[in-house]
UniProtKB/Swiss-Prot annotation:
<feature type="transmembrane region" description="Helical">
    <location>
        <begin position="1"/>
        <end position="21"/>
    </location>
</feature>
<keyword id="KW-1133">Transmembrane helix</keyword>
<dbReference type="GO" id="GO:0008320">
    <property type="term" value="F:protein transmembrane transporter activity"/>
</dbReference>
<feature type="region of interest" description="Disordered">
    <location>
        <begin position="41"/>
        <end position="81"/>
    </location>
</feature>
<keyword id="KW-0812">Transmembrane</keyword>
<keyword id="KW-0811">Translocation</keyword>
<keyword id="KW-0653">Protein transport</keyword>
<keyword id="KW-1003">Cell membrane</keyword>
<dbReference type="Pfam" id="PF02416">
    <property type="entry name" value="TatA_B_E"/>
</dbReference>
<dbReference type="GO" id="GO:0033281">
    <property type="term" value="C:TAT protein transport complex"/>
</dbReference>
<comment type="function">
    <text>Part of the twin-arginine translocation (Tat) system that transports large folded proteins containing a characteristic twin-arginine motif in their signal peptide across membranes. TatA could form the protein-conducting channel of the Tat system.</text>
</comment>
<dbReference type="InterPro" id="IPR006312">
    <property type="entry name" value="TatA/E"/>
</dbReference>
<keyword id="KW-0813">Transport</keyword>
<comment type="similarity">
    <text>Belongs to the TatA/E family.</text>
</comment>
<keyword id="KW-0997">Cell inner membrane</keyword>
<keyword id="KW-0472">Membrane</keyword>
<dbReference type="InterPro" id="IPR003369">
    <property type="entry name" value="TatA/B/E"/>
</dbReference>
Length: 81
């Protein structure tokens, strides 16, 4: 079980031929996937080469908090009886 027999290699070759060879739809799809991966990698490398100039961060602003008026208790507003 450690090594692959001749039949295993024939099956692997047939699958690769179906995926990447010929003029079928599957080979076109695989080619498009490969182009997409290449352009993705190219975009990542371009981002690494040209870092954007970091603009200075604005200092944190403090918010003026107004004290909340004390709310009346429920027992004072809703009396039964």
């Amino acid at each position: 079980m450690g090594s692959l027999s001749l039949w295993h290699w024939i099956i692997v070759g047939a699958v690769l031929l179906l995926l990447f060879g010929g003029k079928g739809k599957v080979s076109d799809i695989m080619g498009d996937v490969a182009k997409g991966i290449k352009s993705f990698k190219k975009g990542l490398s371009e981002d690494d080469e040209k870092p954007e100039a970091a603009r200075p961060a604005e200092p944190a602003r403090s918010l003026d908090h107004q004290p909340v008026a004390e709310q009346p208790k429920v027992s004072e507003t809703h009396r039964i009886g």
